[in-house]
Amino acid sequence: MITFSSGIQPTSFWQRAGRFHFDTILICALLFLLAWGTIMIYSTSAVYAGLRYDNSYYYLQRHLIHVILGFGVITLATLTPYPRWRDWLPLMMLIMLAMLVMVLIPGIGHEVKGGRRWLRIAGFGFQPAELMKVVLIVYLASYLERKRPFIQSFNRGIGPCLLVSGFYMLLILLQPDFGTVVLLATTVLMMLFVGGCRIWHLVACVSVVASLGVALVMTQAYRMRRILAFLNPWEDPLDSGFQIIQSFIAIGTGGWFGRGLGESRQKLFFLPDAHTDF
């Protein structure tokens, strides 16, 4: 959280840059997690990067570039007055719509392991669904602020924002990216609760979302296998349960505090993508 040093709001970028105060605890937590994550990136990727790229620092270097870019974005976003985000929101929504449609087009969207979720621009790859997480929060915050007098009405209050949010989530589901859709749906429901919608409206929304989620899981074999593997990975130890079993082995051999920095074994090609989201 960042606050200005006086009640007068600075008007220029440099005035804002010189007159805000950091939330020390939040910044320290951010830096700690960032440092720890960087160490883990190198620890899990060094062996694989050394074999594939002949450079054990390949993924670490790429990660540090992303960190620098991320700090730049955080700084600019922090120094941007909140009303500006509201003014830019229609353009942001249009850009997200274009990108989420583009990613579904063969030859434009980049397919990785069965999911077409990536766009590549000037050699830089990114997932539009990740950007949608931020844009959706901005949209909901702006909508709930504007519709505050009608928030307890379904037709004039939460209904329209549910339709808009659902449409964007449908585009993401077509990639398919079920996990991101679940996260976005949870975000929408939480923001509606905080925004003051009627409890029975919220209960109805939760019921519909849960029913759709169960239906989507049961109608797709690979999703069902993931659920069953989570409950009992030993039924399919070489396929859907493989990574969970590897995590058991890692915890069993390392105990509470692990084997020591750089001494883990599961990264030694026992896992297909130890350096990504495992």
Residue ranges: model-predicted function:
Residues 11-12, 19-21, 97-99, 248-249:
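A short linear-motif detector with a strong N-terminal bias
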Residues 23, 177, 236, 273, ...:
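Acidic side chains
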